[in-house]
C-alpha cells in the first residue's frame, strides 16, 4: 500500500462512517494535518458566514468587457447554444479571456445536482442530455480557431456514469474536426460512479483537471456533497491509468483556511502525482454564498507559489485572479516545456550515475 493509499483510506473511513459530519471530519483532519516542521496542529478556521458581501480590494478589480472580439465570442457561443462556466460562474476574467477568443465551455447542461457554497451555477433538477452537444462544441472550437480548449461541466449525480461518456464523446468530436487542438477537461468528482475514471482515461485528454477546491476541514460547509479523499483518488487514478496525461488541480483561498492546511493539500496533491496546481482568491458571487473570510494579498500568493514549487509540481499558478482555465493555453505550453526540461535533467542525472 502506498503512502497515498494509506492516506486515502483514513479519509475514506472517517468521511463515510461519520456521514461527513463536521465534528468528526474536523477531528480527522486535525490528526492528519499536524505541521511537519513544528509538530503542532494548526488552528482550525472559524465557521463560514453567509448573508454579507464584503468590499473587494483594488487588486481584485477588473475592467468591464467592451472589445469587439468579446462580443463576437459571446455571439458565437449563443448561436451554437453552448453554456460557459465563464458566464454561469461569474468569472472575473471573462472580459480578458473572451477578447482573446478563449472560453471554457460547460457541457451536460447548466443545472448542477450539487449545491456548493462557493459556486454561482444553478442547482436543481438537470435537463436531459443533449446528444448533439459534442458536435456543436466541436463546431465552436473550429470556428474560434482554438489551439487549446477547456471543457468543464456541472455535476450530474443523476447519470449512471456522472457524464464521463459525454466528456469522451466531446473529446472524440473535437479530435475529428480539429486534430491539432489540445484538449483540457475539468471534471466533477464522479463520486460513486464506477468506471468513470476509466472512460475518461481512455478518451486521452491532453490535460485532466479536477479541483479539490478547498481544504478538507471546510468540505462540510463549503463542498458538502463531495469527499476530499475521493477527489485525491480520482486524480491519482487518472495518472495511473494514463501516465502521459498531465493532471491538474486547483483550490481557492480566503474561505477561512490556515496556511498550514493549504500546504498539506499541496503535499496530498503531489502524493497523487498531480503536475499542475492553481490557487486563486475566493470571490463571493452573491450574499447567499459563503462570505469571504480574507482577501489574500498578492505577496501572500507569491509565498504560496514559492512553497508549492518546492513540492515538485511541474507548474504552479497562484494569484488573486487565478482560475483553473485562466491562461490555460499559455500554461499548457509552459507545462510541456517544464516536463521536457525535467525529463532531460533526470536523464542527465541517470547518465552521470551510470558513468
Curated annotation (Swiss-Prot):
Keyword Electron transport included in the entry's annotation: no
Alphabetized InterPro entries for the sequence: Aldolase_TIM, Elp3/MiaA/NifB-like_rSAM, LIAS_N, Lipoyl_synth, RPE1, rSAM
EC class name: transferase
Reactions that this protein is recorded to catalyse: [[Fe-S] cluster scaffold protein carrying a second [4Fe-4S](2+) cluster] + N(6)-octanoyl-L-lysyl-[protein] + 2 oxidized [2Fe-2S]-[ferredoxin] + 2 S-adenosyl-L-methionine + 4 H(+) = [[Fe-S] cluster scaffold protein] + N(6)-[(R)-dihydrolipoyl]-L-lysyl-[protein] + 4 Fe(3+) + 2 hydrogen sulfide + 2 5'-deoxyadenosine + 2 L-methionine + 2 reduced [2Fe-2S]-[ferredoxin]
Stored CDD domains: Radical_SAM
Pfam families, A to Z: LIAS_N, Radical_SAM
Stated family: Belongs to the radical SAM superfamily. Lipoyl synthase family.
Residues annotated as binding [4Fe-4S] cluster 2: 112, 116, 119
Keywords associated with the record: 4Fe-4S, Cytoplasm, Iron, Iron-sulfur, Metal-binding, S-adenosyl-L-methionine, Transferase
Name this protein carries in UniProt: Lipoyl synthase
SMART domains, per database record: Elp3
Domain Radical SAM core: 98-314
Pathway of action: Protein modification; protein lipoylation via endogenous pathway; protein N(6)-(lipoyl)lysine from octanoyl-[acyl-carrier-protein]: step 2/2
GO cellular component: cytoplasm
SUPFAM superfamilies in alphabetical order: Radical SAM enzymes (SSF102114)
Keyword Hydrolase carried by entry: no
Gene Ontology terms, MF aspect: 4 iron, 4 sulfur cluster binding; lipoate synthase activity; metal ion binding
Organism: Rickettsia bellii (strain RML369-C)
Amino acid at each position: 500500500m502506498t503512502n497515498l493509499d494509506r492516506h486515502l483510506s483514513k479519509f475514506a473511513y472517517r468521511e463515510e462512517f461519520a456521514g461527513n459530519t463536521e465534528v468528526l471530519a474536523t477531528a480527522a483532519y486535525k490528526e492528519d494535518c499536524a505541521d511537519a516542521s513544528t509538530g503542532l496542529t494548526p488552528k482550525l478556521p472559524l465557521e463560514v458566514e453567509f448573508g454579507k458581501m464584503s468590499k473587494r480590494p483594488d487588486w481584485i478589480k477588473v475592467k468591464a468587457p467592451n472589445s469587439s472580439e468579446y462580443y463576437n465570442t459571446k455571439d458565437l457561443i449563443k448561436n451554437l447554444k453552448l453554456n460557459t462556466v465563464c458566464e454561469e460562474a461569474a468569472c472575473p476574467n471573462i472580459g480578458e479571456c473572451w477578447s482573446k477568443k478563449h472560453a471554457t465551455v460547460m457541457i451536460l447542461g447548466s443545472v448542477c445536482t450539487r449545491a456548493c457554497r462557493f459556486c454561482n451555477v444553478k442547482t436543481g433538477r438537470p435537463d436531459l442530455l443533449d446528444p448533439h452537444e459534442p458536435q456543436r462544441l466541436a463546431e465552436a472550437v473550429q470556428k474560434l480557431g482554438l489551439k487549446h480548449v477547456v471543457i468543464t461541466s456541472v455535476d450530474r449525480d443523476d447519470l449512471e456514469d456522472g457524464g464521463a461518456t459525454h466528456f469522451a464523446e466531446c473529446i472524440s468530436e473535437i479530435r475529428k474536426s480539429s486534430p491539432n487542438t489540445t484538449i483540457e477537461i475539468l471534471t466533477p468528482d464522479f463520486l460513486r460512479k464506477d468506471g468513470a475514471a476509466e472512460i475518461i482515461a481512455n478518451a486521452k485528454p491532453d490535460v485532466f483537471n479536477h479541483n479539490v477546491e478547498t481544504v478538507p476541514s471546510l468540505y462540510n460547509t463549503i463542498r458538502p456533497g463531495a469527499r476530499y479523499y475521493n477527489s485525491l483518488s480520482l486524480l491519482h487514478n487518472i495518472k495511473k491509468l494514463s501516465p502521459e496525461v498531465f493532471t491538474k488541480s486547483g483550490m481557492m483561498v480566503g474561505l477561512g483556511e490556515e496556511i498550514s492546511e493549504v500546504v498539506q493539500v499541496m503535499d496530498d496533491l503531489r502524493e497523487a502525482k498531480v503536475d499542475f496546481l492553481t490557487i486563486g482568491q475566493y470571490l463571493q458571487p452573491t450574499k447567499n454564498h459563503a462570505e469571504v473570510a480574507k482577501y489574500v494579498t498578492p505577496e501572500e500568493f507569491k509565498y504560496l507559489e514559492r512553497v508549492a514549487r518546492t513540492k515538485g509540481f511541474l507548474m504552479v499558478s497562484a494569484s488573486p485572479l487565478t482560475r483553473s482555465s485562466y491562461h490555460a493555453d499559455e500554461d499548457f505550453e509552459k507545462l510541456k516545456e517544464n516536463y521536457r526540461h525535467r525529463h532531460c535533467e533526470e536523464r542527465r542525472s541517470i547518465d552521470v550515475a551510470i558513468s
